[in-house]
Amino acid sequence: MSSPLILVNFKSYREGAGNAAGQIASAAELVMQESGVTIGIAPQFVELHPFCKHYEIPVYAQHIDAVEGAFTGRIPAFTVRAAGCVGSLINHSERRLTIAEIEACVEAAKFNHLESVVCTNNVGVSAAAAAFSPTYVAVEPPELIGSGISVAKADPDIIRNSVAAVKKISSDVKVLCGAGIQSGECVKTAVDLGADGVLLASSVVKAKDPEAVLRDLVSLL
């Protein structure tokens, strides 16, 4: 994907389901077309295939499992690819994995030609994740997730230091930041600190006017 990337995670919010989810996806498509900034979405699993078919935007899964076959209820990487997704989140703070599982999921993503967005919670874990050569490492201090307090303002060092740590391991791995991202100023600050984009959720999904929020997010890029 072109940089910067704004990736919107719908989580399991009611506001990110059904018709409301479609309205968010439509707004993301419109703002991406008008601004030229890449806006990806990670909708709920039942929406993956229809959204991939209907909208001209990058669609990511919220999780994949490094399995296939007789594993009821799991989400194999090949299924996500078959649905039309470009990638998947891995190890989100609300769906944590072991180091071995993270590595296996990154490899499953690569095998199925999917981008991998490995979520981390600090500089050390970001460096460890970079060793698996995912597409992105997305650092999110857990205490700021959903807080309305932007990591770009509250803890800019974690962005700057994560970028440095990741690039020391692999210059090919891109870095996103998340937690409390809610405005164009937050996005610009993150990019100025070296990030390749942002990962966010509630500020868009729970907004009364998601399109207006998305327009603000890209306004300073």
Curated annotation (Swiss-Prot):
Its main location: cytoplasm. This is Triosephosphate isomerase. The keyword Isomerase applies. It comes from the Archaea. The active site is at 92 (electrophile), 140 (proton acceptor). It is an enzyme of class 5 (isomerase). GO terms for biological process: gluconeogenesis; glyceraldehyde-3-phosphate biosynthetic process; glycerol catabolic process; glycolytic process. Homotetramer; dimer of dimers.
